[in-house]
Amino acid sequence: MNAPISAAPVVTAGSVRFGNQLPLAVIAGPCQLESRGHALEVASALKEIATRLNISLVYKTSFDKANRTSGSAARGLGLAQSLPIFAEIRSSLGLPVLTDVHDASQCAEVAQAVDILQIPAFLCRQTDLLLAAAATGKVVNVKKGQFLAPWDMANVVAKITGAGNPNVLATERGVSFGYNTLISDMRSLPIMAKTTGAPVIFDATHSVQQPGGQGTSSGGQREFVPVLARAAVAVGVAGVFIETHPDPDHAPSDGPNMVPLAQFEGLLRTLMAFDALAKGQAADAIR
């Protein structure tokens, strides 16, 4: 059975190819960059898993969580300390790296050390930020704002492609549904693919976030990550975005919605099976 999602140009980041009808790719890593040692530990573990499963992997982490609920919350190592770590992960492990940018002034410098610049959902309509990211020529992954309809992403993506950069990914990460709650409308995946012409990614961990749900921090329901991820992959997406951590309950941010690293490989095996079915691959490709 062919996937209902529209084909799109293939976007390449390092050795990873994203396409709505290509085999599933994964973007994974901890929410924020906690230390060099922690980053290399998690990146190495993820590379081993990806190699065993023969799945393409981009490592993600954030140098600055600039939109934390509380002003006193941990934000990450910051730009100066993080860029050498990103470069080391790329050179020593051979993994493409993704990180967020929050201001137009950051884009050119960050682009020297990573493969994908990510635009946070809250900032997805900030034209100057989008244009600065586009100007780097790097792949730009735009998170759909929790306040946007899926078809509204067409204008967002057009700002980047109109600036001469065709290397865009569009990511669904849930839509606001009342206070402290997000829901995922799986119709948005084929709608975004059709209206933006971009490979579509599903963010399975931020989609179960409960924004501000713990007063001074966001809550989450990580037990529903596999449920939503399976549903999205069954539609037929280019990739999944999954935050993972060796000890989520003691992570400095987004712990309630991150997948424990020990459970990550099992989840990926399941998603690869769903992906093979959704994209009409031979049954013997499912294992």
UniProtKB/Swiss-Prot annotation:
Pathway in which the depicted protein is active: Carbohydrate biosynthesis; 3-deoxy-D-manno-octulosonate biosynthesis; 3-deoxy-D-manno-octulosonate from D-ribulose 5-phosphate: step 2/3; Bacterial outer membrane biogenesis; lipopolysaccharide biosynthesis
Location of this chain's protein in the cell: Cytoplasm
Lineage: Bacteria, Pseudomonadati, Pseudomonadota, Alphaproteobacteria, Hyphomicrobiales
GO molecular function term, any single one: 3-deoxy-8-phosphooctulonate synthase activity
Taxonomic source organism: Bradyrhizobium sp. (strain ORS 278)
Name of the protein described by the UniProt record: 2-dehydro-3-deoxyphosphooctonate aldolase
Catalytic activity of the protein: D-arabinose 5-phosphate + phosphoenolpyruvate + H2O = 3-deoxy-alpha-D-manno-2-octulosonate-8-phosphate + phosphate
Family: Belongs to the KdsA family.
Any one of the GO CC terms: cytoplasm
Lineage: superkingdom: Bacteria
EC numbers: 2.5.1.55
GO biological process, any: keto-3-deoxy-D-manno-octulosonic acid biosynthetic process
